[in-house]
Amino acid sequence: MTVLHWATISPFLLAILIPFLYKYARRIHTGWFVLVLPLVLFIYFIQYLSITSTGGVVEHTIPWVPSLGINFTVFVDGLSLLFALLITGIGTLVILYSIFYLSKKTESLNNFYVYLLMFMGAMLGVVLSDNLIVLYVFWELTSLASSLLISYWFHREKSTYGAQKSMLITVFGGFAMLGGFSLLYVMTGTFSIRGIIENVDLVTSSELFLPAMILVLLGAFTKSAQFPFHIWLPDAMEAPTPVSAYLHSATMVKAGIYLVARLTPVFAGSAEWFWLLTGFGVVTLLWGSTSAVRQKDLKGILAFSTVSQLGLIMTLLGLGSAAIYFGESVDPAFYSFAIMAAIFHLINHATFKGSLFMTAGIIDHETGTRDIRKLGGLMAIMPVTFTVSLIGLASMAGLPPFNGFLSKEMFFTALLRATEMNAFNMETFGIIIVVLAWIASVFTFLYCLIMFFKTFTGKFKPENYDVKVHEAPIGMLISPVILGSLVIVFGFFPNILAYTIIEPAMQAVLPTVLADGELFHVNIYMWHGFNAELFMTMGVVAAGIILFLMMKNWAKAAFYMKERDPLNWFYDSSLSGVITGSQFVTRIQMTGLLRDYFAYMIVFMILLLGYTMFRYDAFAIDTTNVTEIAPYIWVITIVFIVATLSIPFINKRITAVVVVGVIGFLLALLFVVFRAPDLALTQLLIETVTVLLLMLAFYHLPELRKEEFKPRFNVLNLIISIGVGFFITAIALSSLALGNEAGIEPISQFFIENSKELAGGYNMVNVILVDFRGLDTMLEVLVLGIAALGVIALIKLRMTGREDV
């Protein structure tokens, strides 16, 4: 394995050690041990900047299941490096923050950091994997780890509810995405992302193109909380704040963004890709921003703001995909500008949203509440928290001189350029997208005002809090201060990211737009003069202030709408319906009778086999090679059939047991006739022991005054029995007939020819069981051994007098 492979899986390796560190080093906060890893990984990945900034790619492969085209291939290009740096960099700050946020005395830190490391490793696997199946495995691990982190405080009902919702929605999307990956393999013959991009013509010309696209986007939309799948994200805020700052602002919710960006070279250029991304992105942007203003909880506001910002990035990726559609017919920088804005805002969002989640956690930690109706006047009490929050909110609102202003202006520029597009009906619908995005920006500015004024201004009321409010300790402030500082640095000096981060990432998203050696020439600057984008920003500020001042007039109606979210109602109703339906089916099926369970399995087998044989016209009988049946075999068979048919009509249990034993002995006799003495001996032993055990069981049963009972005739059982006999016979005869027709020798011929040669045995039955099916037999013996151990344990427990056994 290469160093890059070890770096990818290193969080999983450290997670194995965490329980031991937690147990034997209780005096040291477990987070200090964990902190070292993401910091080292961040420094390790920084060294790749010199490679990716010149267009280089690093790739290493370890075969996993090469026969199926599945290999553990890790590769670093501009896009994967951007996400790797976000995962490890933000991860370092989040773990540092968690050390002071979570008490080592009261919290189960071993669980928390195991889950967090598992999530970090899964995210690294997602962004560094070249193989789609490996990516899918890590993708589902992110869902699992996220669910565990959300339900970290599992004693809270809302935590488990949020974890379940997150798991169900994202795993549903993951399964759909796996279907899309499978279709891509069918079209191209490879699971390699780079291989698929190289064979993109095979994808675009296939009739499976659209189904694959929709399935892949289902995975991306559910993971990145796009409308209408966004409903899991607000409920995920029940997780500890370090989890919210990490998973739901900088990493997990960006996994869908990564997938869309990574597969843009495959699907971009089609109207369906353009409109699915742009349409769902704009709706998500608008829905998230309007929902945020209706929240009363700080983390609730930030959750919906995250939904909104993810919609913004998705919209930009959709608009930027036009660069591949137009190719060299227009200036590459014209539409690729949207991709540049998406990447830049991806970074900006991680900085300002991460800092805001942390300050929200600080406020909750130090005041005991996140309810904006109780908060107020914290500006003087918590000056550092106030300063960091002000920077983050100003950036999120799109105010200069912060980085959020730059990416918001770039967003407006991309929207206006899209209206000039003479494709995808943008000449008709382009202005609608601009208007919806502008309205969403107004509400974005509005919820930033609400957070700021409701939390930090006004009169401080100590009676609203159960604790004495004070500023957070310095250790808890370090991480949000660093992120807040980056907001300012990237605002004043955005081009420090231009050729090291943004340019290489753009080349990975749009590899076919430029000729070899050409660059996108990323250049971001603050002042563009008095243009349409600036006037749009001024309009956003003015409209946002007016709505804030008129808040008393519309707030009551907005909060009323919040309590009646149709999407959450639909989810809850659907889940309740599934549970009710499952309980109904369970009551019908789980009768506690073994014969019913056998009937279910047998009926399913009959239906499946019957459909298959009728569907493919597989019924055939060939009597040319049928061996003549000897008279004594006829006698044995007739007695066998008569004994079997008599069982339902016997009204004494002991007699029925004896007849069943007779059937077993007749079967053993047939084995002797067909020269299988070992099978005959085994059958004789089994039947003898079974009959004796049943007789012994009758001895220990309670005494019954009347042993005889009246047998009941069941038509359904008769139909099932006839169906099984018919189809098993039909399969046997059809297999022989079709095999003879196709010139295929029966499989028994192989064992006849190779039993002595390959296994050194003359008894084919023994050779099959011990050699050709040796592994199967070994596992059967293992199962029997486990069952025997279980019986011994039960007997010993019973002998000790345990009444609960």
Swiss-Prot record:
- Family membership: Belongs to the CPA3 antiporters (TC 2.A.63) subunit A family.
One GO biological-process annotation of the entry reads: proton transmembrane transport
Q: Where are the transmembrane segments?
A: 4-22, 29-51, 80-102, 109-128, 132-154, 167-189, 209-231, 244-266, 271-293, 300-322, 332-354, 375-397, 431-453, 474-496, 529-551, 597-614, 629-651, 656-674, 679-701, 714-736, 778-795
Q: Which UniProt keywords apply?
A: Antiport, Cell membrane, Hydrogen ion transport, Ion transport, Membrane, Sodium, Sodium transport, Transmembrane, Transmembrane helix, Transport
Q: What is its main location?
A: membrane
Q: What is this protein called?
A: Na(+)/H(+) antiporter subunit A
Q: Answer yes or no on keyword Translocase.
A: no
**GO cellular component entries:** plasma membrane
Domain of life, per lineage? Bacteria
PANTHER family per UniProt: NA(+)/H(+) ANTIPORTER SUBUNIT (PTHR43373), NA(+)_H(+) ANTIPORTER SUBUNIT A (PTHR43373:SF1)
| InterPro entries the record matches | CPA3_Na-H_Antiporter_A, MrpA/MnhA1/PhaAB, MrpA_C/MbhD, MrpA_C/MbhE, ND/Mrp_TM, Proton_antipo_N
Quote the function comment for this protein.
Answer: Mnh complex is a Na(+)Li(+)/H(+) antiporter involved in Na(+) and/or Li(+) excretion and Na(+) resistance. Na(+)/H(+) antiport consumes a transmembrane electrical potential, and is thus inferred to be electrogenic. Does not transport K(+), Ca(2+) or Mg(2+).
Anything else of interest in the record? Mrp-dependent antiport apparently occurs by a secondary, proton motive force-dependent mechanism, but the similarity of several Mrp proteins to membrane-embedded subunits of energy-coupled NADH dehydrogenase complexes raises the possibility that there is a capacity for electron transport that could provide a primary energy coupling option for Mrp functions.
Q: Does the keyword Glycosyltransferase apply?
A: no
Subunit info here reads: Forms a heterooligomeric complex that consists of seven subunits: MrpA, MrpB, MrpC, MrpD, MrpE, MrpF and MrpG.
The gene that this protein is the product of is: mrpA
Pfam families according to UniProt: MbhD, MbhE, Proton_antipo_M, Proton_antipo_N
Q: Which cellular compartments is it found in? A: Cell membrane
Q: What is the lineage of its organism?
A: Bacteria, Bacillati, Bacillota, Bacilli, Bacillales
